[in-house]
Regions:
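A charged, aromatic-enriched C-terminal amphipathic alpha-helix characteristic of glycosyltransferases
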Residues: 124, 426-461
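N-terminal subdomain of nucleotide-sugar transferases
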Residues: 16-81, 88-91, 164, 188-191, ...
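Conserved acidic donor-binding segment of nucleotide-sugar-dependent glycosyltransferases
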Residues: 399-400, 404-411, 420-425
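Acidic donor-binding loop of glycosyltransferase active sites
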Residues: 356-370, 383
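Short hydrophobic beta-strand element within catalytic cores of glycosyltransferases
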Residues: 384-387, 397
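Carbohydrate-associated surface elements
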Residues: 199, 221
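Conserved donor-binding/catalytic core segment of Leloir-type glycosyltransferases
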Residues: 194, 234-252, 257-262, 273-281
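Nucleotide-activated donor-binding/catalytic signature segment of Leloir-type glycosyltransferases, i.e.
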Residues: 277, 286-349
Length: 471
C-alpha cells in the first residue's frame, strides 16, 4: 500500500514537472532543428528569388524560421551549384540525381494510361532524390522534418529519424482525392499536416476525421514590402490593363479568358491583356485526380489532351506548348489579337512592375486553386482580383470589396464582371486600396511562419512532456 502511494505521488509530481517544462518551452522556446525538403524539380538559389510556387513557399518560411531556429533546406543540385552552402542562418544541402528525363517521361506515360495513383504520388516518383535526402537526415537528424506533398516517402523519413516529428505540407487537394486505404496507411507515418487553405484543410478533415486535430491551415503569404501599390495614376485617357499570372494551361482557364477578353476588347479599344507564365499542360492523370469529383470541369478539359494516342502524342508531348497556344490565338479576333501580350516567365522585378501597371488581375481557373499566390501578390500590389469562385481563392478575395468572384466555366459571367469593373475606374481604385489593407493584415509570410512555428512547437513540446512523464 505504501509502495503504491509513493508511486502515485511520484507520478503526480512527474506530471506537474512535465507541464511546467512544457509551459517554459512555450513561453521561451528553445531553438529547434528543422529540415525543410524542397521538391525535386526546383533548385534553391541562396539569397535569390526562387522558381516554382513550392520553392517560393519553402524559402520564405525557411528565412523566417531561421531567425529563431536551426534550419536546413534540402533541394536538388543544379549544374554549377555547391554541394552545400550557408546563407545567413540557413544551411542548404543539395542532392544530385540524373534521372529527371526518365521521370518526366514516366509522368507523361502514366497520364496517358490513366494510372492511379498518378505518377506524382507513386513510390517511383523521383525516388532516388527522396531516399538520398532520407540518408542525409539519418546522418544529420532533426527535431522536425517538413516536406511537401509526396507522403508516399513518409515511411522512409520515419525510418531514417524515428524520433523526429514529421510534418506534411499539402499544397494541393490530394488528401481528399487519392485512394482512401492508401492514404490511411501513409498518414500513419505523419505527425501533423499543414495546408495552404481552409479549403484543403476542411476537405482533408472531413475524409479523415480521426486525424482532424492534426490538420492545420497555415496559409501562404506575400512579401508586402516588395509587392506594393504604385502611385495613383491620372484620370486622363490611358489603356486599361488586365493581367494574368500563372501557368498558361487549360486547367487555369486561359482559353475562357481569351473568349471573354475578345468580347470586351471589341467594345473597348483601350483594353489590353498581359499574360505572365510558361505555356504548358499538367499531366492528365493529375488533372483527372484533382477533378475526379467534378465531371463538368473534367469533361471541359478532355478535348485539350486528345482522345487518340496520336492526338495525345501531338498535344501533350511533341506540341505541348504550340498546341494550346494555337488554340488560344484562334479565340481572338483581329481587332483584339494585337492587344494580347504573352511575356513568358519574368524576373521578380519585372513581375512587380507588371502588377504596378495593372488595373485588374483575372484568374478564371477551372480546377480548384488551393490558394493562388498571384491573388495574394495582386492584392498586396493594390490590384483588385476577378477570379473563379472555387477552391481557396474565396478565402483571399473579399467578394465585392477587394474584387469579384464568378462561377467557373461561365464565359458570360466572366465577360460581364470584366465589363462591370472596367467601366468604373474609381471603384477599381477603392477595391485596390481594400485589397492592400487585407493583404497587410492577413496574407503575410510572417503570419504563415508564426502559424507553422506553433505547429512545430506543439509537436516537439508534446514529445518532451511524454519523455518527462516517462522519465
Amino acid at each position: 500500500m505504501l509502495f503504491r502511494s509513493v508511486r502515485h505521488e511520484c507520478c503526480y509530481w512527474s506530471s506537474l514537472m512535465a507541464l511546467a517544462l512544457a509551459k517554459t518551452a512555450c513561453d521561451d522556446p528553445s531553438p529547434m532543428k528543422i529540415a525543410i525538403v524542397n521538391q525535386p524539380q526546383d533548385p534553391i538559389v541562396a539569397g535569390e528569388e526562387q522558381r516554382g510556387s513550392v520553392a517560393i513557399v519553402n524559402w520564405e518560411l525557411a528565412k523566417r524560421l531561421a531567425e529563431r531556429h536551426e534550419v536546413t533546406v534540402y533541394a536538388p543540385r543544379a549544374p554549377g551549384q555547391a554541394r552545400s552552402e550557408r546563407w545567413k542562418n540557413i544551411e542548404i544541402r543539395r542532392v544530385s540525381f540524373v534521372a529527371k528525363l526518365f521521370h518526366k517521361a514516366m509522368q507523361l506515360l502514366a497520364g496517358r494510361l490513366g494510372s492511379q495513383p498518378p505518377y506524382i504520388n507513386s513510390p517511383l516518383y523521383y525516388r532516388e532524390y527522396f531516399l538520398q535526402v532520407a540518408s542525409e537526415l539519418r546522418a544529420h537528424p532533426v527535431d522536425v522534418l517538413h516536406f511537401p506533398q509526396q507522403l508516399q516517402f513518409a515511411a522512409d523519413f520515419k525510418r531514417a529519424m524515428p524520433r523526429a516529428k514529421i510534418v506534411l505540407h499539402m499544397h494541393q487537394d490530394e488528401l481528399a482525392q487519392l485512394d482512401y486505404d492508401l492514404l490511411r496507411s501513409q498518414l500513419a507515418n505523419i505527425d501533423s499536416v499543414v495546408t495552404v487553405s481552409d479549403f484543403v484543410t476542411d476537405r482533408a478533415r472531413a475524409r479523415f476525421p480521426e486525424h482532424a486535430a492534426a490538420i492545420h491551415t497555415i496559409g501562404n503569404g506575400v512579401d508586402v514590402g516588395r509587392f506594393q501599390p504604385a502611385h495613383q495614376q491620372s484620370n486622363g485617357a490611358r489603356r486599361m490593363r488586365l493581367l494574368f499570372v500563372g501557368r498558361i494551361s487549360p486547367d487555369k482557364g486561359v482559353h475562357l479568358l481569351m473568349e471573354a477578353f475578345d468580347r470586351v476588347a471589341r467594345e473597348r479599344p483601350d483594353v489590353e491583356l498581359t499574360l505572365v507564365g510558361k505555356v504548358g499542360m499538367l499531366p492528365f492523370d493529375l488533372v483527372s485526380l484533382l477533378l475526379n469529383d467534378d465531371a463538368d470541369a473534367l469533361d471541359s478539359l478532355r478535348p485539350f489532351y486528345g482522345h487518340s494516342t496520336l492526338a495525345w502524342l501531338t498535344k501533350e508531348v511533341l506540341g505541348q506548348k504550340s498546341s494550346y497556344k494555337q488554340q488560344l490565338d484562334a479565340r481572338l479576333s483581329p481587332q483584339s489579337a494585337g492587344r494580347v501580350h504573352f511575356v513568358g516567365s519574368v524576373s521578380l522585378e519585372e513581375l512587380i512592375r507588371l502588377y504596378s501597371q495593372a488595373d485588374l488581375l483575372v484568374l478564371p481557373s477551372i480546377w480548384r486553386e488551393s490558394y493562388g499566390l498571384p491573388v495574394a501578390e495582386s492584392m498586396a500590389s493594390g490590384v483588385p482580383v476577378l477570379a473563379s469562385d472555387c477552391g481557396g481563392v474565396p478565402e483571399l478575395v473579399d467578394e465585392g470589396v477587394t474584387g469579384l468572384l464568378v462561377p467557373r466555366l461561365n464565359v458570360d459571367a466572366l465577360t460581364n464582371a470584366m465589363r462591370e469593373l472596367l467601366s468604373d475606374l474609381s471603384r477599381l481604385r477603392v477595391m485596390g486600396q481594400a485589397a492592400r489593407v487585407r493583404a497587410e493584415r492577413l496574407l503575410t509570410w510572417d503570419r504563415s511562419a508564426e502559424r507553422l512555428e506553433r505547429v512545430y512547437l506543439d509537436l516537439v513540446n508534446s514529445a518532451s512532456i511524454q519523455r518527462a512523464a516517462i522519465g
